[in-house]
Curated annotation (Swiss-Prot):
One Gene Ontology CC term in the entry: cytoplasm
Binding-site list for NAD(+): 11, 32, 37, 76-77, 115-117, 140
Organism of origin: Chloroherpeton thalassium (strain ATCC 35110 / GB-78)
Catalysed conversion reaction: (S)-lactate + NAD(+) = pyruvate + NADH + H(+)
Modification sites for Phosphotyrosine: 218
Family that this chain belongs to: Belongs to the LDH/MDH superfamily. LDH family.
Quaternary structure, from the entry: Homotetramer.
Positions of beta-D-fructose 1,6-bisphosphate binding: 150, 165
Compartments, as annotated in UniProt: Cytoplasm
Class of this enzyme: oxidoreductase
Family matches, as HAMAP family: Lactate_dehydrog
Pathway: Fermentation; pyruvate fermentation to lactate; (S)-lactate from pyruvate: step 1/1
Main function: Catalyzes the conversion of lactate to pyruvate.
Protein name: L-lactate dehydrogenase
Length: 305
């Protein structure tokens, strides 16, 4: 199966490298306006292939996306230190207005995965521009935030994060919502698990975890200029779910008519794309926060629609 990646920057290249190391697909095509950069990234990753899984990694143009099962769009300008994801919107929206129609004209059967920030609004824009069937466009959403959330909870509780079931929903950004009320380990709520295991837990710890997740990208950008390893792994995981029909539950972003914008909720991701909305149990406070998050996104989307 072929995966096309549009954008040879940090995120696109790291996603390609993650796929090569994981054996996510049989062919990767990297497309970028800077042809020399796309060629260099593809060559560099191709030289790592003998140490992982057999596959083809090459550069190409839009025509080479024909036949791709998954097309990842990671093209765009980088987030500056101190800049919110929403402030990126106008700079990246014009790039998508150019790219998306070209992608659909060449391969309308591919599932489009948006990775460029602000990902929720650009996912909404991509859905509008593409005109593809429901479920065929998604954003990486809060998949990385959810992984960070589970990792920090697991570290605090002394549990493998893979056995922590907790979700970050809403915007991939400052208004994201932590669904604490449904978070659990082995079917036990976090407070119940901590009581049974005699692990210290209080609102201060809970608030610190949420704050660390929300500010993670800002700290990384401040230290090295960009985030890419985490999101690269996320894009590899999403691609595998699509290519191998994993029917994985992931907090990808997609449009919800009820909210009038794309945002993240747990969804079933299969070979056909988004195969249904799973949703998540929330309390009144979390539901209100989710509605506020949707309002933030709608306001930003209205500025470019």
């Amino acid at each position: 199966m072929k995966v096309g990646i549009i954008g040879a920057g940090f995120v696109g290249a790291t996603a390609a490298f993650a796929m090569a190391m994981r054996g996510s697909c049989s062919e990767i095509v990297i497309v970028d306006a800077d042809n020399a950069k796309a060629k260099a990234q593809a060559s560099d990753i191709e030289h790592a292939v003998p140490f992982s899984f057999a596959m083809t990694v090459r550069d190409g143009d839009f025509q080479d996306l024909k036949g791709a099962k998954v097309i990842i769009i990671s093209a765009g300008v980088n987030q500056k230190p101190g800049e919110t994801r929403l402030q990126l919107l106008e700079r990246n929206a014009n790039i998508f207005r150019d790219i998306v129609p070209k992608v659909v004209a060449i391969e309308s059967n591919a599932v489009i995965v948006v990775a460029t920030n602000p990902v929720d609004i650009l996912t909404s824009l991509t859905e509008q521009l593409a005109g593809l069937p429901e479920g065929q466009v998604m954003g990486s959403g809060t998949t990385l935030d959810t992984a960070r959330f589970r990792a920090l909870i697991g570290n605090e509780l002394g549990v493998d994060p893979q056995h922590v079931h907790a979700y970050v929903i809403g915007e991939h950004g400052d208004s994201e919502v932590f669904a604490w009320s449904s978070a659990n380990v082995a079917g036990l709520s976090i407070p119940s698990f901590c009581k049974a295991r005699q692990v210290r837990w209080n609102e201060e710890i809970q608030s610190q975890i949420a704050d660390n997740v929300r500010k993670a990208a800002y700290h990384i950008i401040e230290g090295k200029g960009a985030t890419y390893y985490g999101i690269g792994a996320v894009l590899a995981r999403i691609s595998e779910a699509l290519i191998r029909n994993h029917r994985a539950v992931l907090t990808v972003s997609a449009n919800i008519p009820e909210f009038g914008v794309a945002l993240s909720l747990p969804r079933l991701v299969s070979g056909k794309g988004i195969d249904g909305l799973i949703g998540v149990q929330t309390n009144d406070e979390e539901r209100a926060a989710l509605e506020r998050s949707a309002s933030v996104l709608r306001e930003a989307l209205s500025a470019i629609s």
